UniProtKB/Swiss-Prot annotation:
Keywords: Cytoplasm, Stress response. This is Heat shock protein HspQ. It comes from the Bacteria. The gene is hspQ. It comes from Klebsiella pneumoniae subsp. pneumoniae (strain ATCC 700721 / MGH 78578). Its main location: cytoplasm.
């Protein structure tokens, strides 16, 4: 079993671009269609490591869904980000839902 470095609801940073994001799902390995040779996912070692569905914001503050390798992410040390409060709220909401799941009928 592969252990993931980051968890759902955790805030992270893109290591190269510095963008803040919130993890919304984790795949134990790359699970999208076969990547093109020039994509980062073409690397067999990276494909075998965990991949993360991460919500980030574009330049206009609109949410965007990204799919990133564990090697592309780093832990975020701050809990509050006045410049991106919607991502703080998303992370908080996800963590609350994980701690107190609702029963379905």
């Amino acid at each position: 079993m592969i252990a993931s470095k980051f968890g759902i609801g955790q805030q992270v940073r893109h290591t190269l671009l510095g963008y803040l994001g919130v993890i919304v799902d984790v795949d134990p390995e790359y699970s999208l269609a076969e990547p093109e040779e020039d994509e980062i996912a073409a690397n067999d070692e990276l494909r075998a490591a965990p991949w993360y569905h991460v919500v980030m914001e574009d330049d206009d503050g609109q949410p965007i869904h990204t799919y990133l390798a564990e090697a592309q992410l780093s832990s975020e040390t701050r809990d509050e980000h006045p410049e991106q409060p919607s991502l703080d709220e998303l992370a908080k909401t996800i963590r609350q839902q994980l701690q107190a799941p609702r029963l379905r009928n």
